[in-house]
């Protein structure tokens, strides 16, 4: 019984690990929170510290979602109502940790896209495949990560519903998408002003 209560806490603490900040401090003299967009996620790390550290950050942030949600599916029955509620709770705990990391005083967290991808890689792999294709399409079309992230987030609940038919898991996807949009408010403002950075020049 104790593991049912400990896993959401573990998910939050794991989700709180600021890999972007850790990698940039280990391998450079940069504090990523004060460079570029100030975000600790993979996109800003890649822009400021290079693609290798950006890729390491991306993998670390994805695993923050994969590991606890996979453990949740091992504990709870994925096709059971209470199992779906528990899995969603664990996923949202990991996602919340990434957004509001306790280790850096709940400030300067990431925008949630990579950790959400890790969560839904376990919850709904087929939905994630569709969202990755949407992400790639928008990156190639508009050359901006923020637009691709927002487009994928908008389609997340639809893709999860189509794949799983679960109201609980779709609700988890809706909450996730709303927070991703909330964390991208500055990007949306820059997009409207025409100042959002492009990927390739």
Model-derived features with residue positions:
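Interfacial segments of multi-pass membrane proteins
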Residues: 46-50, 72-76, 111-142, 154-163
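C-terminal ends of transmembrane helices
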Residues: 20-21, 95-106, 135-142, 185-189
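Multi-pass membrane catalytic core of lipid/isoprenoid biosynthesis enzymes
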Residues: 47-74, 86
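Hydrophobic alpha-helical transmembrane segments
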Residues: 5-10, 54-55, 87-92, 129-133, ...
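Helix-coil boundary and interhelical linker segments in multi-pass alpha-helical membrane proteins
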Residues: 1-7, 67-89, 121-128, 160-172
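Short, non-helical or kinked segments that cap or interrupt transmembrane helices
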Residues: 30-39, 104-117, 144-152
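Cytosolic, membrane-interface loops and tails of multi-pass inner-membrane proteins
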Residues: 21-52, 108-109, 185, 189-201
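N-terminal signal-anchor transmembrane alpha helix
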Residues: 2-27
């Amino acid at each position: 019984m104790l593991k049912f209560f400990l896993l959401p806490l573990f998910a939050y603490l794991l989700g709180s690990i600021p890999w972007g900040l850790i990698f940039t401090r280990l391998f450079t003299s940069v504090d990523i929170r004060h460079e570029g967009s100030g975000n600790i996620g993979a996109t800003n790390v890649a822009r400021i510290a290079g693609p290798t550290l950006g890729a390491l950050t991306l993998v670390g942030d994805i695993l923050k979602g994969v590991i606890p949600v996979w453990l949740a599916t091992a504990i709870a029955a994925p096709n059971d109502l209470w199992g779906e509620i528990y899995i969603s709770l664990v996923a949202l705990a990991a996602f919340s940790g990434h957004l509001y990391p306790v280790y850096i005083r709940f400030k300067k967290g990431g925008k949630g896209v990579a950790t959400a991808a890790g969560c839904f890689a376990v919850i709904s792999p087929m939905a994630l495949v569709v969202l990755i294709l949407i992400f790639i399409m928008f990156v190639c079309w508009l050359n901006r990560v923020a637009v691709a992230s927002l487009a994928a987030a908008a389609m997340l609940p639809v893709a999860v519903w189509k794949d799983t038919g679960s109201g609980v898991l779709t609700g988890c996807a809706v909450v996730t998408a709303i927070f991703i949009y909330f964390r991208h408010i500055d990007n949306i403002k820059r997009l409207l002003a025409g100042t959002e950075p492009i990927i390739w020049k």
